[in-house]
Amino acid sequence: MLLPSLDSAAGRAKNARLESDLATIDNAILLYKMDNGTCPSTLSDLVDEYIAKGKKFEDATGTELVYTLSGDKLTYTLKGRNADGEQVTSDGSSDAEE
């Protein structure tokens, strides 16, 4: 019965990393917006100055996060999936997960 326990621990670790990554990206977008007046067009626009080079924008399943920018470039949503395959959404607000 050790294997299910390890799977559960691995899933929790992936979910914790996803939560941390979303918070980091939210903060980077906020800093970008403060410097430029709008949100970045793509997450790649954050690399080097706001996010370390080589950062992968992936969710807990290894799939690329989906970044959607509003028409006025002032708001965004960032979506991915947790280790259980449930959608997690961040929009930079204090209640980032739905």
Regions picked out by a protein language model, each given a short descriptive name:
Residues 18, 22-29:
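N-terminal membrane-insertion helices
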Residues 87-92:
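Edge beta-strands of extracellular beta-sandwich domains
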